[in-house]
Amino acid sequence: MSATLDRLRRLQELRPQRTRPEPEAPPSPEPLPQPVVTPRGTTRLEELVPGEILENSAGLCYVRTQAYPLASARGQYPLGNLLARHPITFAPFHPNFGLRDTVDFRQAAFIDTETTGLGGGAGVYCFMVGVGTFECGVWSAECGIETNHPNAFPASSDPTHFVVRQFFMRNPAEEGALMFALAELLERYEMSVTFNGRTFDLPLLRTRLQQNQRMYPDLRGSARLLAAERPHLDLLHPARRLWKRRLQSCRLINLEQMILGLQRSEEDVPGHLIPMLYTDYMRTGNAHEMRRVFYHNCEDIVSMVALADHLGRAYAEPAAQSDTPLQGLDWLAMGQCYEKLGQLPSAENAYQQALALLREPAAQADAYQALAQVQKRQGNWPAASETW
């Protein structure tokens, strides 16, 4: 028995032995991306965009204030020239704007928003709301830019500056504070001025205000200026009526270039990129690109002042546009506006002005046809026959 066991042991030793594999080390985790190292202070909002932290009963938000003397030129005319115009000029052409002769541009708030999406809906936030107003007070210059002084006071019959305040929520938790600050400012004014705000900015602000009223009951009944029935001049509509025949686009940036003769700096950012830039800011905390968004928003607001002045001149006294005279297609558009209002003599004059300037055959044909129709409606058959 022992001999048999010895032979079995020797046979076992002759067999190739299996070696137990060493346990594999667990895979090393992929290294986490390292934060971008930049010089101290270059990513902080407070240093890139000087402003102040505003506190109210809903919390904190950030606000940047800039002031422009009324003598500052925006295009060919000083900003203060708009105060010689009256919003009622646009009332006959846009009766649904609710404009009244008792409210002028001194009582207007120029509003522009930057949002987390390009459409509307309850899920879209207004992360920045810029408001421009005519004010008077004490202001100090810093680095060539007028900035708010603590002793400044708003809303006067004799303003000295156009002031832009940009309310910004650094995260969604600050939306309530932003809405409180906005509502407090808007209570002082009687009319809003926007560019495409009738279909975008104001409805979205009303939605966000209603959402926040559930959490902050004190907001209920505030910001009445945003209500649909309050006076509201949306500059996009008179601009389209006047320039849609001549310009391929009536976007604000295009009107700045083609009508006001302005060119923004390289600091500007295309509007369609702004929601993505805010998302990146929320994710990284790097405010470098947000500086460009503040610039874009402020430029939009200040340009509205110059555009309102330009449109006011054109609609009130088109023949007196000596520095920036209307072109042939502009006169054709004005003629159509007057014709819709039943102001046939003014329409006839506008069509005649158009024919004196137009050189393109198709546009001339449109002007001759329109002129003849107006002459016919006035009973001036000999003139209509000659025009035809």
Outline where the language-model segments fall:
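N-terminal accessory regions of nucleic-acid-interacting proteins
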Residues: 1-104
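Short, basic, low-complexity termini and linkers enriched in Ser/Thr/Gly/Pro
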Residues: 134-160
